[in-house]
Amino acid sequence: MENRFQNDTLFSEWFGQSLSDVRFPDNVTVYSQADSAVSFENVRQPIKLVRAAMGSGKTTALIHFLKQVPKELSVLLISCRKTFAAEILHRFTLNGLEDFELYCDITERQINNRKVIVQIESLHRLTENYDVLILDEIMSIIKQFYSKTMTKTKEVDCKFLSLIKNSSHVIAMDATLTRHVVEFFAAFKPDTQIALIRNTFVSAMFSNRVAYFCDTFFGKEFSFFARLEDKLRWDKKLCLFCSTVLAAEYMHDLIRSRFSLKKVLLLTSKQGKCSSIESWIRYDVVIYTSVVTVGLSFEPVYFSSLFVYIQLAKGGPDMVSIFQSIGRVRRVIDEDIYIYMNPVLIKSYDPLAPIAMPPCSDWSVAEQSIISESCIDFRGKCSGAHKYNFCSVLKCLFRYRHYIEKTTITSLSDSLFLLCSLLCENSIKVDIVGNGFPMRKEVFLSFLQILVEECHFIEKKITLPGDNMTFQEIISSRETIMNGDFYENGNQLLHKDYITDMGKFRATFLSPGVDIFIASDIVSDLKNESKRYVFVNVWLQKCVSAGVESTRIERVFNERIKSYVLPKSFLCDEYFVLGDISGVYEWGMLIDLAFLAEMIRKDLKLKSCTDTTTDISEDDLLLCAARRSSDILQIMQLVFTVHVQFFQRYSLQTLQLFNKLRGMRIVTGVFSIEKFSISILRLFFKCAFNMTLSASKPRYIPGKAYRNLTKNDLENMLDNWEISRTNLKTCKELRKALTEASRARRKQTIYKLQGSDISLSVSEVGVFGQHASPGVCVSS
């Protein structure tokens, strides 16, 4: 499973393209189907593994197979999503398979129905094994083991393996099924014959398509938006996929501003889950995000073209998810897809390393060697993830694919390469500004450079507060009255439970000096997932700093924080979970991060990991990086999926190649150990605590900002420096004299953290049982 891979085969190994070059175990028989849709005819092996592209008839073949299954046999179909499960049930019902039940329609907690469709997260509810097991979109099923919604990983993993072990027939299908899936089944059931069906047939509705990659969004005749405008002027119906909510809202507003009479539908997570797409035929333009994915397919011949806006961003959807969302529209009249990748959020000169070499024919041996070394470093760090995946066999076996998917998001060249590979494997032709794929190195690098130079930043919408009153204003106002369970002030309502919730939160998680109004502001911020993540990291680091044993921290974290609920608004009609955090789903990762953060805090002589008042000397930064660089790089990869190589790998030639693959201009000069040290610590603080490590000048008084210096402070500083302050009477005159004296002294550069110092408000004490008073009491 863990054979060494090189940069030229990394994607093909983990996304299925290399199946034709592999020697499989003796219990595996390979079937090739090239000229027709997927078929199980004359395939007698009890385990059938199918790799076939979208539109190759996988579901049709499955339905035909199930119609031939004897009535007395039990059948279980496992899906990756609830919407997919519902769509499969609908397809089954339309084709006469009416005895299947959907897991979410079964009211009993335990499921023992004979024929059932279940989402992977609910697998632990099953009490029986099944004769026939169907794993549709198996790679997406495995991917769900890394999702934060997978709360019972160990139970689901054990049940999944038990089902495979005890089923007499298994069908597993996916467009990117890999050799590792084949090897897993062959090793897990060595005495069972396995059929690997490699189907390369693709229906015309996909094989005739061409994906045009645009290098600019605005500005020229063949830019992304110019093509979109041209289509709309010809009254063509368009479907537009956007990888982020921000991009979708931006495109929605832009189209509405230019084409006010067009009917535009916007589908994002803000509008809720998308369970049906039948209404799309009522609109001129449909804009959707990854809420529309596997399981939802638009079949009517309605849309002329498909447009794809990919905003590359850490934490955004990976290229496989984007590829699956692109395929939701099954028929495109003009058979064209226009794709624009916006790298503005990943533009950086930080030493992030790519993990794959795009398949250009003219890379030099030295360039190939550089990426190969990066690939080896990447593999070495990913291998360390096994200690976090002890509760899941699936997570351990397929961790490389998970890290590849997540790491490529922050690499422009890797993202483009992987998406092009997925399109080509589905027989969709790729056109990059008039060039096919693969292409010459200079053309590929030039395309990346134009993307970066011409990319645009999307401003977030700012919602003005309007007439809304704050928590403090409502309960402090003399005009506020009690109306049932609510405090009422005009049209402003505040449920009495909100006060109780804020008092409880304050007593449990915050320092004694934090009042209930600040607690309310903090809770409002915590509605943002990234803010919750920082809050949890700060709390854990403070626990470690206080000397609390890790076993006790883990127990309290699981019992209190993971399930702690907070109101989304004053009305207390909706709640969110404090432990609903992004990125990290393993306790071991969280606690390792906390211990590393505490060691870094001590090295840098900080009060906390969000301390904004302490000056950090360059010597302390360099010493910290020298001590901790290996641990930092490991955590950066395993927790934050950011790939940075060890310093020894970064020659001038390496940096130049990496900058080219990021679309950045070549920077001359030596990449020093000082620059490397500052870069990795800057990345660490940004990822873990959303703090920015910036170069600055030393503070005149440690712990006190320049703007907060009093007249007495200024006079004492000038006296200590033996600077005459004769005729200097005002603060303005004193400040000017101090600034000029400071320049003359040519002080060394120091560093400081900038951002929100949430550590000042967070306490590790309350959650362990020491409770403060609940806070303010409001009379009715």
From Swiss-Prot:
Classification via InterPro entries: AAA+_ATPase, Helicase_ATP-bd, P-loop_NTPase, Replication_origin-bd
Entry keyword annotation includes DNA-binding: yes
Gene3D superfamilies reported for this sequence: P-loop containing nucleotide triphosphate hydrolases
Residue ranges occupied by any Helicase ATP-binding domain in the UniProt entry: 39-195
Ligand binding (ATP): A52, A53, M54, G55, S56, G57, K58, T59
Role this protein plays: Probably involved in DNA replication. Binds the origin of replication (ori).
Protein name: Replication origin-binding protein
Organism whose genome encodes this protein: Human herpesvirus 6B (strain Z29) (HHV-6 variant B)
Lineage, broadest ranks: Viruses, Duplodnaviria, Heunggongvirae, Peploviricota, Herviviricetes
